[in-house]
Amino acid sequence: MSVLAQGTQVFMLAAGAIVRIPGATAFNPGGNPRDQVEETDLEDTTSRRYKKGLGTPGSASLTVNADPQEPAHVQLYEMANSKGEDKVKFFVGWSDGTEPPTVATQTVSLPTTRTWFEFEGYVSDFPMDFATNSLVSSQVTIQRSGDGKWTPKTPASGGGE
């Protein structure tokens, strides 16, 4: 069964609090392709041989309708332009649920009634796009650090067949 993108929400854990990032119009978490580690030896005469190596996290992109009155947007802009290299945890809640994540003593709990994708990274850019007859937008770039984690929604029990 497919899942609609409409209803997806993006959150971040910043300064010990869960922050919803409203106004998102697109999100791409980027990939984490594995490097190739060569294991070819001198006796190989026709082709190289490889093993799967470490992942190299790419950049995530989050497009938002930028709003200077929205604290989360200002916070993302400030993160992109700060001298610090603080990493932030991001949580993408799929449209198959509505409950937001919660946090207590820096531990985030993700409701099992919703599918989640989470990753860590730093905000590397918040460019603003001004065009005729459109809303001001920004394609926020987040440099991922480490693997992402996909947690499917837990099916409701008692459905029976």
Give a label for each model feature.
Residues M12, D86-S95, V108-L110:
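Short conserved beta-strand and strand-loop elements enriched in small hydrophobics
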Residues M1-P68, E120-V136:
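Solvent-exposed edge beta-strands and adjacent loop segments
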Residues D96-W150:
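Short beta-strand and beta-hairpin "edge-sheet" elements
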Residues L62, V88-F90, I142:
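Residue-level detector of buried hydrophobic side-chain packing
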Residues M79-E85:
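Soluble sensory domains of the PAS superfamily and closely related sensory modules
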Residues Q69-L76:
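Short, conserved charged micro-motifs
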Residues T154-E161:
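Intrinsically disordered, low-complexity terminal/linker regions enriched in Pro/Ser/Gly
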